[in-house]
Structure formats: C-alpha cells, structure tokens
C-alpha cells in the first residue's frame, strides 16, 4: 500500500470512500426519492446488476492499496435494506484494516440490526431525521411514518455501543420552524446534530435556491437561544463546520454545500451499488468498475484505472452552481448516497 494519498488536479487527496449498497429505501423523502417518481413500477436494479459483497470488498481493498483510505461510509438508498449488510462490514474491516467505518441510515431498522453492526466493526451511525413533529415528518418521508421508529433506532444504536449523530435537511417553508426544537432536543440527548442545506442533488426534487435556508441563518436562530462557539475541524476536508454549545461538550454541525461550498477540500469518492465510481456528489456520470471486475481485469489494471480517474479530477460543482448548472442531468442521490 502506498503511504501517501493520490491527489487530483486541485491537490485534493483521495481520503474517504462512500459505498452505496442498495438503490432501494423504505422512505420516499421528497428531496431524495419522491413517491411520484419512485413508485411501485420504478425499475430498481436487479440483483445481477449490483456488486456482490466480494466484488465490493475487492475494489475497496485495491483502492486502499492504491491510496490509503481513512474513512468508509456505507450508504444507500437505505443501507439496512441490503440483506446481511453486516457481513460486508465484517469483510471490509478484516480485509482492509480500515477502522473508521460508519453508516448513514433512516434508523428504522436499527433495533434489529444495531448489535450485528457493532459486532461487524461499524463505529457509528448517522441517522436522518428532519422534524420532531410526527405529522410533518410523515409528510417529509412520504410514508406517514412518525418519529418513534427513528428515535428508537437511535437508542438501539447507542445501547449497542455505536456512536450516534443526527442529520437534518432544512428547507424553507417545510421544516425551518423545527431547527430550534431539534437543536434543543438533541442538545439534551447529547447527540451531535448536523443541519444540511437543501441541495440540488439528482433531478427529481424540484430544487430551487429560494428553498434553501442558509448556514448563517441556521446558526443565527440557534445562537440567539443557545450560544455557540466554533470548534476546530478534526481533519482537513471535514464536511461539517462544527460548533459547540457554550459550557457543554455537545456539538452541532452545518453542512453548507450551497452557500459556503467546501469543494476545495473535498476528498471523497462515491462507489454506487452497481459499481460506478463518482468523484462528485453532483456528477453527471460515473466510471464503470463492475465491467472491469467481471471481465477478469487484474488488480493492477483496476488500480491504474482508479489512479487515472483521480489524477484528472477537477470537480467543483458547488463553487460554480447557478440556475443553469442545476438543469444539467445528475445522478440521483438515492443511487450514490448523500
């Protein structure tokens, strides 16, 4: 394994890898998988089209040998809908030695999976919850599901020994009134809550700039009631700007891809469930590694392809975002993870 990470054209290292393990989800959140598009007849991927755990593990092992990966995040869709996903986590931690393996989930399946995930080597979960109001949350998730299954999932993860963070996508006129109640609730719980600016990911969510609640407005709302102080990032390229409630150890974070983009330090790649590598969340196309795997490519050929892709990477979509760039066809977030 090389001791130094590869860098791209903007001198950004390849440090983090997000792995989507399914394109399916039991929610239909309108900003990700709206029900009118992802309905009963939607053509989800067939089993033969998605990477097996063995194929995924081989790719990650080779990627890690090419450029040391510091963190893996398992995503979806809803990753816990992939049968035996804990087995993949066991394989990844055993084969690569990468210790920082996390998962983003809606939390509803954690009560029956948390112990297995912990034993497999998962370190923490980030659970998505956009409101504490059952009716409002049910509208957002498109399934009428209240908050209890998600909150129960968080508790199950905590009891299993997993770290827990919470993500909230904030949309003007939808759930911006919930910013303060969420902040208060999770401050008392002691969980880090991260507010995410509503982003133009994919092509299905009808994104408009007018629907974005800016980082500065989120912080102002909270700081007036719960004074905050800045916290230094844990590592270069950390996506969330971190703050701590004064007089406590409890933190919040803001992920501000729209109003305060972090493209210049982005060190992440995304491996989709069918084996395409994307070098940006807002990418229009991916690089096919499944075909390489299934055509008998050697380890060296796979590593060479990864290096060639990363060395010419120059993505900086969020720094160039306009009403015109928003119209270009992008891969859906449910396909490559957030």
Swiss-Prot record:
Its cofactor is [4Fe-4S] cluster. Pfam families: Fer4_12, Mob_synth_C, Radical_SAM. GO terms for biological process: Mo-molybdopterin cofactor biosynthetic process. Residues 9-229 form the Radical SAM core domain. Keywords: 4Fe-4S, GTP-binding, Iron, Iron-sulfur, Lyase, Metal-binding, Molybdenum cofactor biosynthesis, Nucleotide-binding, S-adenosyl-L-methionine. The keyword Metal-binding applies. PROSITE patterns: MOAA_NIFB_PQQE, RADICAL_SAM. S-adenosyl-L-methionine binds at residues 31, 77, 128, 199. SMART domains: Elp3. Signal peptide: none annotated. Coiled coil: none annotated. The keyword Iron-sulfur applies. Pathway: Cofactor biosynthesis; molybdopterin biosynthesis. GTP binds at residues 18, 73, 104, 165, 268-270. Its EC number is 4.1.99.22. [4Fe-4S] cluster 2 binds at residues 263, 266, 280. GO terms for molecular function: 4 iron, 4 sulfur cluster binding; cyclic pyranopterin monophosphate synthase activity; GTP 3',8'-cyclase activity; GTP binding; metal ion binding; S-adenosyl-L-methionine binding. It catalyses: GTP + AH2 + S-adenosyl-L-methionine = (8S)-3',8-cyclo-7,8-dihydroguanosine 5'-triphosphate + 5'-deoxyadenosine + L-methionine + A + H(+). Binds 2 [4Fe-4S] clusters. Binds 1 [4Fe-4S] cluster coordinated with 3 cysteines and an exchangeable S-adenosyl-L-methionine and 1 [4Fe-4S] cluster coordinated with 3 cysteines and the GTP-derived substrate. It comes from the Bacteria. Monomer and homodimer. Belongs to the radical SAM superfamily. MoaA family. NCBIfam families: moaA (TIGR02666). Catalyzes the cyclization of GTP to (8S)-3',8-cyclo-7,8-dihydroguanosine 5'-triphosphate. This is GTP 3',8-cyclase.
